[in-house]
Amino acid sequence: MDYLPIFTDLKRRPCLVVGGGDVAWRKARMLLKAGADVRVIAPVLNQAFQQAIEQQQVSHVADEFESSHLDGIFLAIAATDRKAVNALVYQSANQRQVLVNVVDDTQRCSFIIPSIIDRSPIIVAVSSSGKAPVLARLIREKLEALLPQHLGRMATIAGNFRARLAKTVTSFSARRQFWEQVFDGRFSDLVACGQEQDAKQELINLTQSTSPQGQVALIGSGPGDAGLLTLRALQLMQQADVVLYDYLVSDEVMDLVRRDAELVCVGKKAGFHSVPQEETNQLIVKYAQQGKRVVRLKGGDPFVFGRGGEELEVLFDANILFQVVPGITAAAGATAYAGIPLTHRDYAQTAMFVTGHLKAESDQMDWSTLARGKQTLVIYMGLMKSGHIQQQLLINGRAGDTPIAIIERGTQKKQKVIKGQLSELEQLAKNAESPSLIVIGEVVNLSEKLHWFGKQEQSLQQSAVVKLA
């Protein structure tokens, strides 16, 4: 081990920064964040330093560095572009037994500054001992993605509860088991949802009961590309005991679920066995009441034609804790991957999202509004009703030559885009499979320039050739 990682309390300790440029300011800002009394030595300062001095955050000596500037200093950092000055800072600090760091010169460092993941009071430091700083930064980025933002709040609440716990739970091993249960259970989810008073009450409840309480996370998995999954969604998926998922959730996303989680398909798809919504609701409640951490995983966003609101109402009535993690809805994700902007100053000032899967057989659509020009119309689950959609839009005034696109499996490796005109919609839909999104409006033509992902768009004629072949 080349260096011993030590976390140092710098609050109100005098720390010196030599240099007045951008690099020196980054180091000074880090010291300020740790509560240090920062002094800067430099003839000239950048604007950030000048603002900090005006706000009395740092003190400044407008002079060249001298050894006497280290008198009474706890820690020093040299960040100038002059090797002779940096060497003098290092030599002078060593003579006074002052900790010193010369930026980008490990030979002149008695300490080095690691890459930091700050979830105060939880702090994680990553260092390559100065050998590969970029690698250390990449490792830090990966850890940033894995560590939830609410870790610090969890640690603070837990720290304030430790003394109280010691009075009621005297055994060290029992206290350890208590905290393991706390940090892997409902307490964590309450803090993540900003319900800190309930989280504190949960700690009290856990000292009086050993039965775990279940919770549900309603998660949007996005349109298919696992890279579009949110960090929060990934964290919860890897903590789940049970995952109830739809057919629209891609295999890529399902591969990221915790390996030993129970997987339950509750999807609905034409031609396949479908689980009624009422049965899905009952399953979610059942698993949560067993004390399990349940993930309800939906394609796209759960609140955009996903019936997420209905499922949460059932959980509310059953007094079960829940949280919602939004996902990128197909209208945003699939169109972006197809090179179709939803709005454009020249072509569309409005974007409307509607579902083609109507309740029962009633048609409650305001077709006169949907048929307006200068807007983009995005239709979810519209393939089976494509003929009706085409007919109603034409009857209500939308031009037959309005550009349209059907995006099949948007954002996924098998994405296919079929383009044509509104007058061809019903015929085009015969060449597409679910899940598909219908986009209607002049913005579709922009995909000729903006298309960047997957197969090139197919026209009606190309699709017909494929079918004949």
From Swiss-Prot:
Sorted UniProt keywords: Cobalamin biosynthesis, Lyase, Methyltransferase, Multifunctional enzyme, NAD, Oxidoreductase, Phosphoprotein, Porphyrin biosynthesis, S-adenosyl-L-methionine, Transferase
Residues annotated as binding S-adenosyl-L-methionine: P223, G299, G300, D301, V304, T329, A330, M381, G410
InterPro entries named among the record's database cross-references: 4pyrrol_Mease (IPR000878), 4pyrrol_Methylase_sf (IPR035996), 4pyrrole_Mease_sub1 (IPR014777), 4pyrrole_Mease_sub2 (IPR014776), CobA/CysG_C (IPR006366), NAD(P)-bd_dom_sf (IPR036291), Siro_Cobalamin_biosynth (IPR050161), Sirohaem_synt_dimer_dom_sf (IPR037115)
Q: Name one Pfam family in it.
A: NAD_binding_7
Q: Does the keyword Methyltransferase apply?
A: yes
Any one GO molecular-function label of the UniProt entry: sirohydrochlorin ferrochelatase activity
Tell me the GO BP annotations in alphabetical order.
cobalamin biosynthetic process; methylation; siroheme biosynthetic process
The answer, when asked if rRNA-binding is one of the entry's keywords, is: no
Q: Which residues carry this modification: Phosphoserine?
A: S128
Catalytic activity of the protein: uroporphyrinogen III + 2 S-adenosyl-L-methionine = precorrin-2 + 2 S-adenosyl-L-homocysteine + H(+); precorrin-2 + NAD(+) = sirohydrochlorin + NADH + 2 H(+); siroheme + 2 H(+) = sirohydrochlorin + Fe(2+)
UniProt cross-references to HAMAP family, sorted A to Z: Siroheme_synth
Which family is it part of?
In the N-terminal section; belongs to the precorrin-2 dehydrogenase / sirohydrochlorin ferrochelatase family.
What is the recorded name of this protein?
Siroheme synthase
Tell me what organism the protein belongs to: Photobacterium profundum (strain SS9)
